Each structure stands twice: as structure tokens, then as C-alpha cells.
Amino acid sequence: MIIKPKIRGFICTTTHPVGCEANVKEQIELTKAKGKIANGPKRVLVVGSSSGYGLSSRIAAAFGSDAATLGVFFEKPSSETKPGTAGWYNTAAFDKFAKAEGLYSKSINCDAFSHEAKKKAIELIKEDLGQVDMVVYSLASPVRKLPDSGELIRSSLKPIGETYTATAVDTNKDCIIQTSVEPATEQEIADTVTVMGGEDWELWINALSDAGVLSDNCKTVAYSYIGTELTWPIYWHGALGKAKMDLDRAAHALNDKLAVKGGSANVAVLKSVVTQASSAIPVMPLYIAMVFKKMRQEGLHEGCMDQIYRMFSERLYRTDGAAPATDDKQRLRLDDWELREDIQQHCRDLWPQVTTENLSELADYMEYKAEFLKLFGFGIEGIDYDADVNPNVSFDVIEL
């Protein structure tokens, strides 16, 4: 089929397999160009490995550290009428490139919140790897099916206490709007913590630990975002922030457990990037377009791959073998460049000035749009989007 982008809301409903493969190849080449990560992990499980920071983590481990990787994700292959999800094509490409270099790569397509996912991962680790020395937890899901009861719990992207009104960008019409979001109820806050908090990360690590498949000195990391006062009402001070604070709670509990055998658990606070997850959060697209422009001007811009490589090489797996620098909550801070005072002051000054007319001039808005489309395999140089492509891409994946 000939595949063109179709946008609905903040999701692109079509994906381009050749474009997705090109994206993955670009991240692999970037990793190789940066060089090998000394003291890097060798057997890595990535929960939520098909896009964004999870995919970059799998690439950093495999191509930066020659690690065997096992990826867990929930994606859809193509059907007769429509292409598969971007994460499906991303993983197919990763698997192809990893195997071409003789690297172990296995993937499980399933609900990562389920008991079955954990059982299958443990089984594969026991059979093929013995143990893992790193577990990356990078799930971004709006819904969690509770593994025991089967109840579906939904998260909310809402403020707490009062209605949040702010300048935002309508990414469909490319115009500046005022957006208002009603505050979350107590139940919605609790549900958001259930879906996006640290409980499932704990369930994964405890299951792996009980099964004896975590090596001594095993490191685990889960990803978070804190941001600044520009996004705090909807994010850190909102329902989602409560969930991310629960991730901090889980990190401390897991760290106490793993430290007994020389291991560690940390939350890594990452910078804002264009992902399917961030595009769904009100005000984030506008903030990202602003902050990207300033960071590019200052030579500080990083994409997912740059961030994760820096986390591996300068935090978790330092050449000198020293423990990573953390903040007072034992978090790894990779948002340090974004939070620089001059960068943030620039955004604070700019925010009230943005109009539909000057949007592309004051912020990297067209670059934001291009990055967004790229997530789905579109707008990549050298690809003929009028060519007929086969959407049916298969690879070595276990379906649960």
C-alpha cells in the first residue's frame, strides 16, 4: 500500500514501515558514532521498549554496550486495511539490525502489566541469559488492567485543586488557543497513581528477584519528567505528578532491596522530547517548541538517543566506575541542561508573547511538527512516500 500520514487528535493513525526503520537506523548510527560504553550492561530487559526513551535504552544497551536485550511492549502488526503501529516497525527494525551484528534480541508483545508478561520474561531469561544485569522500566500507558481482578483503570492528565487555563497550540490547526482542563477528582488522582506510578515497576523487580534472574549489582531505572513552573500545574503538581512521586517511593523501596547485593534502583528525570506520550499532554507541544529552539541556539539540544546515551555513559556506567551523581531524592538528573536558568527564563519571557502569527518565528514549531511525524516514519529524507510498500513486516516476536 501507499501510506500517507493521517492525523487524528494528537495521534497519527498511519505509520510508514520504511520510515520507522530509517529512524531506528539513525539512532543506532548515532550510538555507534559516540563510541562504546565502558563497563556497560551485557544482559538487559527493557519493559516498554518499542518507542521513545525505552527504544533508545534498548539501542544504547545493544549497540553501545554489545548487550543481549529482551524487549517487552504492546504493539499491533498490520492488518489487511491498515499498517501496524510505529512501535511494531521500530522493534522489527531493531531486531533486524541487532541480529545482523550477532546480538541476542528477543521480544514479547503483550500487556506488560500482566502476570503472564513477567512469567514469560523470566522463562526466557532463565533459558537464554541466565540473569539480567539491567532492567529499564519505560512504560507509558493511559490504561492499566489490574493483573489479579482484570479491572481496567484509566489515568488522567488533569491538574489538582483548580481548573488549569493556559496558552497552548492546537497542533491540528496550527494556531494558538487558550485551553482549560478541569481538576481531577480524588478517584482520578488515585487511578493515575495506579496506572502510572511505581507499583508495576515493583511487581516486575520483585518477580525477577524472586525467580533469581537478577544478577548481583543489577541496576534498574525508571523514567520520569519534572519540568518547571510552566508545565507544573498540568504535570508535576497534577495527577500525573502524584504518579511520578510514587515512582520515587518505589525507587527507594527497590534500592533498599537491591543494594543488599550491590544493585541499585533510580528514577532518571529526563528532558522533554517529542514522543507520542508528551504530545498528549496539554501545553507540552508549545513548551517543547519553545525550549527546543533555545536549546538548539545554545548547542544543548538532545533527542531521546542523546539523553539515554548520556545517562548510560555519564551516570550509570561511568568510565571511572564511580557511583552516579544524584539529587537529594536519589534521582539521576538528565534534565539539567533544560532546567538551566537562562533557558527557562527565555521560555517564561516568551510564553505571554506567542500568537498564531509569530508561533513559527518565536518557537521551533515546524520542527516540532516534523519530529512528531517522524515518530510514525514520515517526513524522512531519502524515502519515496509515493512508492508502494509492504506493511506486513514480521520478526522474531513472542505473542502472548
From Swiss-Prot:
Residues given in the record as substrate binding sites: 225
Claim: Magnesium is one of the keywords in the record: no
Top-tier EC class: oxidoreductase
Residue positions of the active site: 235 (proton donor)
Record site: Plays an important role in discriminating NADH against NADPH: 75
Keyword Lipid biosynthesis: yes
Domain of life, source organism: Bacteria
Pfam families named in the record: Eno-Rase_FAD_bd (PF07055), Eno-Rase_NADH_b (PF12242), Enoyl_reductase (PF12241)
Binding site for NAD(+): 48-53, 74-75, 111-112, 139-140, 244, 273-275
Known EC number: 1.3.1.9
Pathway connected to this protein: Lipid metabolism; fatty acid biosynthesis
InterPro entries assigned: Eno_Rdtase_FAD-bd_dom, Enoyl-CoA_Rdtase_cat_dom, FabV-like_NADH_b, Trans-2-enoyl-CoA_reductase
Catalytic reactions on record: a 2,3-saturated acyl-[ACP] + NAD(+) = a (2E)-enoyl-[ACP] + NADH + H(+)
GO molecular function terms listed in the Swiss-Prot or TrEMBL record: enoyl-[acyl-carrier-protein] reductase (NADH) activity; NAD binding; trans-2-enoyl-CoA reductase (NADH) activity
Keywords: Fatty acid biosynthesis, Fatty acid metabolism, Lipid biosynthesis, Lipid metabolism, NAD, Oxidoreductase
GO biological process: fatty acid biosynthetic process
Assembly notes: Monomer.
Biological role: Involved in the final reduction of the elongation cycle of fatty acid synthesis (FAS II). Catalyzes the reduction of a carbon-carbon double bond in an enoyl moiety that is covalently linked to an acyl carrier protein (ACP).
Family: Belongs to the TER reductase family.
Protein name (record): Enoyl-[acyl-carrier-protein] reductase [NADH]
Origin species: Shewanella denitrificans (strain OS217 / ATCC BAA-1090 / DSM 15013)
Gene designation per UniProt: fabV
